[in-house]
């Protein structure tokens, strides 16, 4: 299964690095200076205040493209509208992992109602230059809203 992580901030970088280290086929979408840093150094992770940072060579892309089975979106709520249009033309389910109270309907109206999943990552961290400093956590909440297809099967 091919995964695209859309958003190279703290949580997107952390999740993509962890998925890559676990052997999954994952790419990380980034732009601008963050893209250049990731191409040069990979995702750099440091737990807490540790002076040691490890480099994880997650493949990075600048633009979303077809060929991914799942796209995990790690952006802030005010950035969602900007990513919907590029996602609408792609295949694969889209998991929105952010603080989103609007429900799946406005997202599904643009990208297709059967493709939307919502979740909330329980990871904490901060950017220290190009290094992601994180606190260890192992939980992810998720919910798939029933679609016409899943309601009729129930």
Tell me what each language-model feature is.
Residues 1-51:
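NAD(P)+-binding Rossmann beta1-loop-alpha1 motif at the extreme N-terminus of oxidoreductases
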Residues 5, 28-31, 73-74, 97, ...:
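Active-site-adjacent beta-strand anchor residues
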Residues 7-12, 42, 100-102, 119, ...:
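Glycine-centered flexibility sites
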Residues 37, 90, 109-115, 130-154:
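Internal alpha-helical scaffold of NAD(P)-dependent oxidoreductase catalytic cores
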Residues 46, 61, 143-144:
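Residues in well-ordered beta-strands of folded domains
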């Amino acid at each position: 299964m091919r995964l695209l992580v859309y958003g190279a901030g703290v949580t997107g970088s952390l999740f993509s690095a962890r998925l890559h280290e676990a052997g999954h086929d994952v790419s990380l979408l980034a732009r601008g200076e963050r893209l250049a840093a990731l191409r040069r150094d990979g995702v750099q992770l440091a737990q807490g205040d540790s002076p040691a940072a490890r480099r994880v060579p997650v493949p990075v892309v600048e633009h979303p493209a077809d060929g991914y089975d799942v796209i995990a979106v790690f952006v802030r709520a005010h950035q969602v509208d900007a990513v919907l249009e590029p996602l609408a033309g792609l295949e694969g389910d889209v998991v929105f992992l952010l603080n989103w109270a609007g429900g799946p309907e406005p997202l599904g109206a643009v990208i297709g109602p059967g493709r939307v999943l919502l979740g909330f990552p329980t990871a904490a961290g901060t950017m220290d230059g190009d290094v992601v400093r994180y606190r260890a956590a192992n939980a992810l909440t998720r919910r798939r809203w029933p679609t016409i297809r899943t309601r009729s099967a129930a």
